[in-house]
A protein has these predicted regions:
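Extracytosolic ligand-binding ectodomains
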Residues: 1-106
């Protein structure tokens, strides 16, 4: 019931993508050995429900994802007012948090 009104959010999509990427890594590694799966994770690609193909960064395992800016509507949903043309590489260490300047640059 009400399936036409159900929407996904970023945490739901992240869980879905994460499970599928883990499955792909296990298949690539041909084992569930943690170290081998971690090694197999980098560089993976997966078509997410948002429509974009996401890539797992080889050096830090963060996802390259699209950036969207939305305007909240009265019904609690969003109108996307800006969307990048494609996924953007993640910056894992915020330059706005003290102490991060000494962390590895990517």
């Amino acid at each position: 019931p009400n399936a036409d009104k159900v929407v996904t959010n970023d945490p739901m999509e992240a869980t879905y993508v994460g499970m599928h990427m883990w499955k792909q890594a296990v298949e690539k590694a041909k084992t569930t050995d943690v170290d081998k799966v971690i090694e197999a994770m980098g560089g993976q690609k997966f078509k997410a429900p948002c429509g974009f193909e996401l890539t797992m960064d080889k050096t830090n395992h963060h996802l390259h994802k699209p950036v969207m800016i939305g305007e909240i509507r009265g019904d609690g949903q969003f109108n996307v007012v800006y969307k990048t043309k494609g996924p953007i590489r993640a910056q894992p260490w915020s330059p706005f948090i003290a102490g991060n300047e000494s962390k590895q640059k990517i």
